[in-house]
Amino acid sequence: HFGFVNMNIITLQPDNEHIIQQAAQLLVDAFREHWPDAWATFDEATKEVHEMLERERICRAAIDDAGNLLGIIGGIPQYDGHVWELHPLAVQPNMQGQGIGRALIEDFEAQVRSRGGLTITLGSDDEDNMTSLSNADLFENTWEKIQNIRNLKGHPFEFYQKLGYVITGVVPDANGIGKPDIMMSKRVK
């Protein structure tokens, strides 16, 4: 099920400082190349991880046999728990492509279902000209542009599509002029 990687997926607990520190560093490292403003500093990332640990949220971590963090996923309930926002998902850059992200998402979907959730949504920013939606006028022929989206630089939207997520909209200029957020959703009920 997990490819070549031997791992366990656990609920990250607020007292697990060792993994919390690794998670903060992972957020900085995993987003640095294409989303440098996401968590520019370790302190910002540490604050995000602590927010992920709030009681009503989901926070799951993939850990290898030696106790090292391989990836992390978080979720925020919305619409009275009918919808959950997947935020964030990060996998160690040198471990990507080995099924860790897929396993975290499948686990997250099960967590959402067990809480009565119906739909998962996510936003996947395009801050680095990674898709044909970058620098496009998304106020004109919006759905045609979404329907004809092209992946120019390995943007993760195709990863999510393979797991059953569909593009349900965009937020034009979410990260500055010509830098949209691509909204995706999946029914999990």
Region roles according to the model:
Residues 141-189:
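C-terminal "cap" of GNAT-fold acetyltransferases
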